């Protein structure tokens, strides 16, 4: 943990220009510095926006809400630095809000249990309509934080942060991306010509994690002439079984006037839903996208819940991806059939990161922040895989 949050990331921060901080709290934060403590009932199942129904993650201490800088309407990145200590694992957390105060999908990752002050240097992506933010620390046993600062970062800075982190992780085999854009001619044409492209990441909290790995920074760095506006649009534990209905589609997709929709996550089949029903609801969602002029990428499920029996370094068992396997969250036969039926592009976010995790021999929780969700390590494996499809597939602009 110290290598991840201390040496590697602090070293990456050494080259960063000292932008004026948007939020800065020297010393230990608390009620005297304007922060608020919010309690919780331990063990109670609660609805967490953009994540779903889970046992309460614990109480939180949260900053006052503050205004973001940068141009509204474009993706931005922010470097968050702090030191923290907590008796049990918890979460650092950033909530976002639009100009009217409506909550947008959050960014959060793991606080590692430690009796000593541990430095963190993390990168936080904000979507185009984000206008305000709030920082929080969440644990079941109480967390302490000090020297909290959040400042704007450039695309290059954010991409470097990603690549520095990736260099500390198990080797990730590049996915096959030669024909990644073959079914996306309109989007590719706009990317190559520098025209604005609205991209919607649609799914569940796992799709939110795909976003939170700062994949957009890697994509924008690989395609510097492109004018990409990337939006994350998610609902906890939700997939096409919900989004295929017109009122939900309009709320989560159509309002962004997308040129490209990425459908992903692990919730595109409700556990009570037959495989054929899941396939049909995905087909209908894709057809709705096409009807409003958007092209579609269907992403296979990235790693989430543990799929290994133990931490032995073994090859990834691809049988786990079959419909009806014991790893419900990785099944994708119906996903591949829906893409084939509709002519949507299919990008594999399963194989490369799952193979890297399988071969690593790392402990079962080394890539995760809780049972379902990845920490910055797991997120980065997914982000690098997704960025490879964008960059390598649209070779006309790759540096």
Give the residues covered by each predicted segment.
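Positively charged n-region of N-terminal signal peptides that target proteins for export
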Residues: 1-5
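Bacterial N-terminal signal peptides
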Residues: 6-15
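Extracellular and organelle-lumenal recognition/adhesion modules and their flexible linkers in secreted
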Residues: 18-178, 182
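Conserved SGNH/GDSL esterase-like catalytic core that processes O-acyl groups on lipids
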Residues: 171-283, 307
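Residue-level recognition of beta-strand->loop/alpha-helix junctions
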Residues: 232-236, 300-301, 348-351
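Alpha/beta-hydrolase-fold catalytic nucleophile elbow
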Residues: 264, 299-300
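A short helix->loop->beta-strand "cap" motif at the edges of active sites that frequently abuts
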Residues: 291-295, 344
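Catalytic His-Asp segment of secreted/periplasmic serine-dependent ester chemistry enzymes
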Residues: 303-399
